[in-house]
């Protein structure tokens, strides 16, 4: 696990984008993408670059269950707004949180990932150590699955909604085994509230109680953090 300390989120986005360019130069064609406030500066770098994404495939980590794609808090909307409207990809996959049969959707998404192995995966980390929507206690063997979101995750995401009652209670998420199958993982974390999770991920025991700790077992992980997120590291 390589740790790169940066001054702020802006620099973090630039460093992540430079790592992406290196991966693309080595033949990467499929990107695993994340949502939320953490990767926004990475997407800004991508949008402002002259990079042609028309031959690339993207696979998103997760999507809320039951949120229409036109809702500005759906991850489908987020990806179009932050990236796809400006940089169309050859193919862009997201879980369908409106599927009538969620179990069939889970199987479909696992098939998508199997057919498009991820070369470069962007991750954030939750305050409770979740990656994607893989909450504490999720099996490391899990592939795509329907998740009941924990209260801490609902609370953390409520700032994006008019009311905490509007936050979806479930999501479809790529599983930990799916994430670990990525050839390279770049995890971004900024801010003091991520410091405890970063400490556990980097130096704590590998435990399903802190999902991100599994990344210690991956042989190509780069962690990009600001000083606040790094503040509990030795």
Swiss-Prot record:
Into which EC class is this enzyme placed? hydrolase
The record's annotation in InterPro entries points to: Glc/Gal-6P_isomerase (IPR006148), Glucosamine6P_isomerase (IPR004547), Glucosamine6P_isomerase_CS (IPR018321), NagB/RpiA_transferase-like (IPR037171)
Q: Which GO terms describe its cellular component?
A: cytoplasm
Q: For this protein, what reaction is catalysed?
A: alpha-D-glucosamine 6-phosphate + H2O = beta-D-fructose 6-phosphate + NH4(+)
E.C. code:
3.5.99.6
Spell out the PROSITE patterns in the cross-references.
Answer: GLC_GALNAC_ISOMERASE
Q: Return one Gene Ontology term, BP aspect.
A: N-acetylglucosamine catabolic process
Q: In which pathway does it act?
A: Amino-sugar metabolism; N-acetylneuraminate degradation; D-fructose 6-phosphate from N-acetylneuraminate: step 5/5
Keyword list, A-Z: Carbohydrate metabolism, Hydrolase
Active-site residue list: 62 (proton acceptor), 128 (for ring-opening step), 130 (proton acceptor), 135 (for ring-opening step)
| NCBIfam families linked to this entry | nagB
* HAMAP family with a match to the protein in the record: GlcN6P_deamin (MF_01241)
- Full protein name: Glucosamine-6-phosphate deaminase
Q: Which gene encodes it?
A: nagB
């Amino acid at each position: 696990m390589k740790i790169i300390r940066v001054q702020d989120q802006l620099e973090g986005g630039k460093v992540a984008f430079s790592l992406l360019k290196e991966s693309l130069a080595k033949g990467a064609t499929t990107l695993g993408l994340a949502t939320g406030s953490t990767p926004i500066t990475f997407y800004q770098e991508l949008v402002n670059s002259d990079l042609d994404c028309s031959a690339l495939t993207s696979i998103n980590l997760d999507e809320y269950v039951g949120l229409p794609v036109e809702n500005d808090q759906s991850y489908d909307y987020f990806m179009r707004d932050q990236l796809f409207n400006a940089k169309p990809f050859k193919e862009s996959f997201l879980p369908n949180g409106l599927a009538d049969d969620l179990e069939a959707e889970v199987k479909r998404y696992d098939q998508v990932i199997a057919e498009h192995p991820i070369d470069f995966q962007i991750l954030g980390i939750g305050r409770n150590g979740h990656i994607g929507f893989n909450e504490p206690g999720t099996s490391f063997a899990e592939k795509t699955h329907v998740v009941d979101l924990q209260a801490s995750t609902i609370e953390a995401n409520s700032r994006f909604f008019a009311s905490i009652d509007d936050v979806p209670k479930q999501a479809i998420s790529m599983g930990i085994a799916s994430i670990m199958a990525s050839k390279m993982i770049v995890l971004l974390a900024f801010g003091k509230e991520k410091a405890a999770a970063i400490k556990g991920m980097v130096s704590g025991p590998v435990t399903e109680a802190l999902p991100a700790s599994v990344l210690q077992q991956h042989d190509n992980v780069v962690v990009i953090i600001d000083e606040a997120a790094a503040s509990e590291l030795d």
